[in-house]
């Protein structure tokens, strides 16, 4: 059971198994990473606050190594951050990079700006060709002429 205090003094209780709570930590961390990792000093504090609130529950659930204090707040520990979560983020980013690149190149080849119901089959076929190339060779065969 995790407890989350909501503004106005209301406390929310969520019943989770230990395994579910551990997965929730991953989800919260990844969500905050997506929302804030590229923002520099312009972070969305509300997401940091949610992350801190959820990770604070590590203290009462035998997961102390996953949280640490920083500037008066509880944040995911270095042990948590180095425990494989960034490998999952990187795998997702790599997949998205190649999917987006394949779509952009396929649309370029088709002289189209966006997928439409009329071109979706051709687009998918061209994307699959590019994705096969990327799977075999990564970016080794990509050239840019300037």
Task: Locate predicted features.
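Short, Lys/Arg-enriched N-terminal segments with co-localized hydrophobic residues
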Residues: 1-11
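Short, extreme N-terminal segment that most often corresponds to the first beta-strand
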Residues: 9-37
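Structured domain cores in non-transmembrane regions
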Residues: 32-106
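Glycine-rich, aromatic-bearing surface loops/beta-hairpins
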Residues: 108-146
């Amino acid at each position: 059971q995790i407890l989350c205090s909501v503004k106005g003094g209301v406390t929310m209780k969520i019943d989770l198994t230990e395994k579910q709570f551990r997965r929730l930590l991953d989800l919260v961390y990844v969500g905050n990473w997506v929302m804030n990792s590229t923002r520099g000093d312009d972070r969305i504090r509300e997401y940091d606050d949610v992350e801190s609130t959820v990770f604070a529950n590590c203290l009462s659930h035998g997961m102390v190594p996953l949280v640490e204090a920083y500037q008066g707040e509880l944040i995911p520990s270095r042990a948590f951050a180095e425990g494989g979560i960034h490998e999952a983020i990187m795998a997702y980013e790599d997949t998205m990079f190649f999917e987006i690149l394949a779509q952009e190149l396929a649309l370029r080849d088709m002289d189209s700006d966006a997928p439409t119901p009329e071109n979706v089959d051709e687009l998918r076929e061209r994307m699959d060709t590019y994705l096969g190339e990327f799977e075999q060779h990564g970016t080794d065969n990509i050239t840019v002429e300037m």
